[in-house]
Amino acid sequence: MAAAREAEKKEEGQKQVKLYAIIRIRGRVDVHPDVEYTLKLLRLHRKFHLVLYPSTLPGIERMIHKVKDWVTWGEIDRDTLVELLRRRGRISGNKPLTDEYVQEKLGLKGGIEELADKLLKGEIMLHKLYDKQKKIWIIKPVFRLHPPRGGFKGSIKKPYGAGGELGYRGPAINELIRRML
């Protein structure tokens, strides 16, 4: 009976893994030092930079809550993730991410699509793909985006729920990412 409950909890834990896409919306001026430090830890150094973190990462919820007035975040879907990796994914030397590179370095025969699936399941964490011997990123953990086509729909000083752009937006982040690619 207890073993069945543990197996059920493991299944629930695997289903609850969400991949957060976090985008810095506001700039560097007048940022509180604590917030600036947290943005640095999240690798969000400039406007329109995007990072991907799993929801199961310890402390990620508290870090996002601290910087909620400078970023927007939500759960990224598979199609948007594949398009993001193809169009904005970079490797060391600022070269574009390709299927051949993923197959060679990570051993994933499905290329970028398989990488996206493993990222969504939480099997691979983008921020941990670092080659310590060569001291280079296998895949850079930061995606540099354009400002959104058509501009922002609301103020970048108000929360998303109040007609602005900041804070949690759930699956609506995918539409914003597609406009910024």
From Swiss-Prot:
One of its GO terms (biological process) is translation. Keywords: Ribonucleoprotein, Ribosomal protein. It comes from the Archaea. SUPFAM superfamilies: Ribosomal protein L30p/L7e. Pfam families: Ribosomal_L30. Part of the 50S ribosomal subunit. Belongs to the universal ribosomal protein uL30 family. This is Large ribosomal subunit protein uL30. It comes from Hyperthermus butylicus (strain DSM 5456 / JCM 9403 / PLM1-5).
